[in-house]
Amino acid sequence: MKTALTIAGSDSSGGAGIQADMKTMTANGVYAMSAVTALTAQNTTGVTDILESTPHFLGEPLDAIFTDIFPDAVKIGMVSSADLIVVIAEKLKQYKAENIVVDPVMVATSGAKLLRDDAVEALCRELLPLAAVLTPNIPEAEILSGMTITDATGMEAAAKYISEKYGCAVLCKGGHKVNDADDLLWRNGFGKWFHGKRIDNPNTHGTGCTLSSAIASNLAKGYDLDESVERAKEYISGALAAMLDLGHGSGPMNHMFALKGAFTE
């Protein structure tokens, strides 16, 4: 069985973060492991508190994982401090990790920045050059490129700039401000659009975590990047179309929509 590791924050409501990542990885047929960057107290209406991991206690589980069940792919989500970013980069290089998917969680749904400037600098300096693919949304792509994105042409310019600057593929997600379901993959000097059907579901908590984890899962299984993105988009469309309705705010998707059998009844 192929394996995947998520390095991200914990969401107490289970809709995003490592909980969404591990459900997604399991649903996509790989064995899921985790290293926690932060504990959060949150639900579908918002985040009330965050307790960040220490650099030492992030490094320890990474050592434990890489020296025992080596991951075939790694997904990196929310990492809020420069010190933690440095530890992650050191461990990934030490163990020669492959198929690294970076979801640069930098901007909250409200538009507020989630990373301090030194953490953004560390992310760009330490992690982005290690990535096989980076999955920014529009606000994150604007921060990384220094550009304002208002249309598909702007997405292409920003993705090209980021890809060339950091030497990685970039999947620029069009759900913010530009369109709802079309994403752009830029790599090796060329762009490819992945068109998706808009699903009218207000419960979208954890979509970014889910997409990046699904991509990592498919890379772990040996699919190339184009196939991994295509399969990940199909999976997230199914999770949204299942129309799970939980909580009083923007609720989670049904990550296990395809799960059937005696134990689900």
Task: Describe the function of each predicted region.
Residues 14-30:
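N-terminal basic/disordered segments at the start of proteins
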Residues 29-33, 192, 218-232:
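Phosphate-handling active-site elements
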Residues 52, 226-265:
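Charged C-terminal helix
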Residues 7-13, 191-205:
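Short pre-catalytic strand/loop immediately N-terminal to key active-site residues, enriched for Gly-Thr
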Residues 19-22, 142-143, 201-225:
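Short, small-residue alpha-helix embedded
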Residues 3-6, 26-109:
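Conserved N-terminal subdomain of the carbohydrate kinase-like
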Residues 117-191:
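Conserved phosphate/ATP/ADP-binding segment of small-molecule kinases
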